[in-house]
Amino acid sequence: MVVGVVGAAGGVGASTLAALVARRLSRATSTALVDLDRGAAGLDVVVGVEDVDGARWPDLSGAGGDVRGADVVALLPRWGACAVLSADRTRPTAVDPGVRIDVLHALACEVGALVLDLDRGAVVDGDAPLAACDAVVVVARADLRSVAGALALRPRLDQAATRRGLVVRGGASAALGAADVAAASGLDLWHVARRDRALVARAERVGPGGRGPAARAADAVVRQLGIGT
């Protein structure tokens, strides 16, 4: 299974949710978490493995062609049982599209679950690997900015004809209700999460994620995927 996670707007916690979903899936099957967010500092920082040895995207620049998924997985740092393919904050560089396609295909053939932290701009531009995804999760706040962002994503999601769900973050004081966001964006509402102040306080550095609103959102997504927690 390949699962994409994308934010309807910046700062909604899409990378955090992607990481926690991957962590949960890794309890049931071999799992890799892949960083495709072009503007981020690296998922390895988010999950706290930035100092762990292993390959990042720049190390795979020559990996085009016939790539063996087992070889890639063996090179990657681990976050618990989950392999992590991240950008490198010290070596910011664009990934060659051909290399990205070959590496993702190899990983999808090797692991039981592949979780992609998608770049919102790449999705809108048609450069994200949506066709490879079995499901895409859109993360939004309960506000008009997220509605507009989700609507911008919809044409590409519709073209991919993949299953898609919506996770809405917000609280009782949110400008809109989660059902309003789902209705306006045309996406199925999978979960409503209250604002996680503890997560914000620790700068969205993700631990194993056993408790809290973000953890419950990840549990809800995994239930929707039907793999189990």
Predicted segments with their positions:
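Conserved catalytic-core segment of NTP-binding enzymes
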Residues: 32, 98, 103-104, 108-202
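Short, hinge-like loop/turn segments at secondary-structure boundaries
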Residues: 49-53, 156-157, 182-185, 207-211
